[in-house]
Amino acid sequence: MSDASFLRQTKSVHIIGAGLNQERPAHRAFIDMKGRGYRMVPVHPRDAGSTIQGVPILPHPWASVDPELFVIFLSPERTLGLLRKWVVSNRNTPFIWLQPGAESDDILEFLNEAGIPHSSGKCWVVTCIQNDISCEDPLPKVPWVLQTTSTDGDHCSVWRYFPPGTDLNLDEPLEWVGDLMDLRSSDERIPRYIRSLCQDGESLAETAQRLAIPPS
């Protein structure tokens, strides 16, 4: 399958390295690709819990059980560390798109030996724009949820629910963040617990909203 065909069929894209710094290429890529139908998932450990244009930033990609595409904007050293950790965890490995500057001979050797499909030497954004590539079957926009540690002294967990596109600049300790799709499929502890609280006849979105604190 060609890159163009694959990208048109792809629905979710994890932008590894996309944080709040608007000068960074990963952040700009997120902005440049808006409107092309992809469910873009920004990943940045320091800025996790805040949002880019109403989309929550994840601290890592582990919430996704079956990701489709990682577009990586990291140094070669950090890229290789991420890939090794992912493979060792025995998770389903997505297609890896190495942005210019993220690749190295060691990374390419690792990917080839592991049999992981990948692209290198080409910018994902430029490839999509020059070839007019968009997602053929976009996913619907969904709510997102957040669990933080209370800062009022009791150290309790605080669960919040946000409609699609809601912006937030987080200033509290993060416990978990993700959208409704992550909440539905993640094997992490907090999503599993929230799913266990679903009542008969209640959707997961309704459960997440019922458990949330009222908006301030």
What are these regions (language model features)?
Residues 45-47, 63, 99-103, 122-127:
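Short, acidic/turn-prone active-site loops that include or flank metal/cofactor-
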Residues 87-114:
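ADP-ribose/adenylate-binding Rossmann-like module
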